[in-house]
Amino acid sequence: MSALVYFSSSSENTHRFMQRLGLPATRIPLNERERIQVDEPYILVVPSYGGGGMAGAVPRQVIRFLNDEHNRARIRGVIASGNRNFGDAWGCAGDVIAQKCGVPWLYRFELMGTQRDIDNVRKGVNEFWQQSPRSA
């Protein structure tokens, strides 16, 4: 497994961001019947759903992944994507997950992100793991 876990819908925006990021990552399956377990601490990268409100912002697949105690115990931070058209609620899945899991919300980016987002996340992830213990 890897230190980054992500979910991407069929739009593939988050997947394209992760490909451009170029860091090892594990994808939460789109098919809700497929399950994965993560055996090391990780940062979760997640898109926000819905029309800008908190209800429905976190994808069902991510909820199911985090409802697994084994996976939830290893989350160390969250990065969220979203759409600025949602106003103050853009990227709010990150806020919901950070609050419910008691981890920091590290960054948010719009849609597929910009090169600046890629650079910021790459640098931030490296700094985060240097400062944070990886022990489960």
UniProtKB/Swiss-Prot annotation:
It comes from the Bacteria. GO terms for molecular function: FMN binding. Coiled coil: none annotated. One of its GO terms (biological process) is protein modification process. Belongs to the NrdI family. Probably involved in ribonucleotide reductase function. This is Protein NrdI. The lineage of its organism: Bacteria, Pseudomonadati, Pseudomonadota, Gammaproteobacteria, Enterobacterales. The gene is nrdI.
